[in-house]
Amino acid sequence: MPFQSTVGDYQTVATLETFGFLPPMTQDEIYDQIAYIIAQGWSPLVEHVHPSNSMATYWSYWKLPFFGEKDLNVVVSELEACHRAYPDHHVRIVGYDAYTQSQGACFVVFEGR
């Protein structure tokens, strides 16, 4: 008699960053998260990578970190510019906390194809 497992066949799925397990965020929710990064005094940084390399390599910077940037629109426009330049790449924002020298927040804004 074959063994009947009561455990489901759960497949491991690669998730992307902080909000990877949640439903996709709306544009307003993304703006709120970026505003939070800025309000904390963290330096926004835009990174991108092709989906095939997202788990195996470091992500490439889009320009330099935006040290001291306080304008949400500047950060959003750079995210969109990176997405236009690399439409097939994942694009994420990192909020770098210089005090703790670590990432305060990091999440994917645009998923690549």
UniProtKB/Swiss-Prot annotation:
Q: Which UniProt keywords apply?
A: Bacterial microcompartment, Calvin cycle, Carbon dioxide fixation, Carboxysome, Photorespiration, Photosynthesis
Q: Name one Pfam family in it.
A: RuBisCO_small
Domain of life, per UniProt, equals Bacteria
Q: What induces this one?
A: Cells grown on urea as a nitrogen source have more enzyme activity than those grown on nitrate (at protein level). RuBisCO activity of urea- but not nitrate-grown cells decreases with rising temperature (from 25 to 28 degrees Celsius, present versus predicted future ocean temperatures); there is only one RuBisCO in this cyanobacterium.
Q: Name one GO biological process term.
A: reductive pentose-phosphate cycle
Keyword Methyltransferase carried by entry: no
Q: Which GO terms describe its molecular function?
A: ribulose-bisphosphate carboxylase activity
Task: From the Swiss-Prot or TrEMBL record, state where the protein is found.
Answer: Carboxysome
In terms of SUPFAM superfamilies, this protein maps to:
RuBisCO, small subunit
- KW Transport (keyword) present: no
| Entry similarity comment | Belongs to the RuBisCO small chain family.
- Explain the purpose of this protein: RuBisCO catalyzes two reactions: the carboxylation of D-ribulose 1,5-bisphosphate, the primary event in carbon dioxide fixation, as well as the oxidative fragmentation of the pentose substrate in the photorespiration process. Both reactions occur simultaneously and in competition at the same active site. Although the small subunit is not catalytic it is essential for maximal activity.
An additional note in the Swiss-Prot or TrEMBL entry is: The basic functional RuBisCO is composed of a large chain homodimer in a 'head-to-tail' conformation. In form I RuBisCO this homodimer is arranged in a barrel-like tetramer with the small subunits forming a tetrameric 'cap' on each end of the 'barrel'.
Q: Subunit arrangement?
A: Heterohexadecamer of 8 large and 8 small subunits.
Can you say what this protein is called?
Ribulose bisphosphate carboxylase small subunit
Organism per entry: Parasynechococcus marenigrum (strain WH8102)
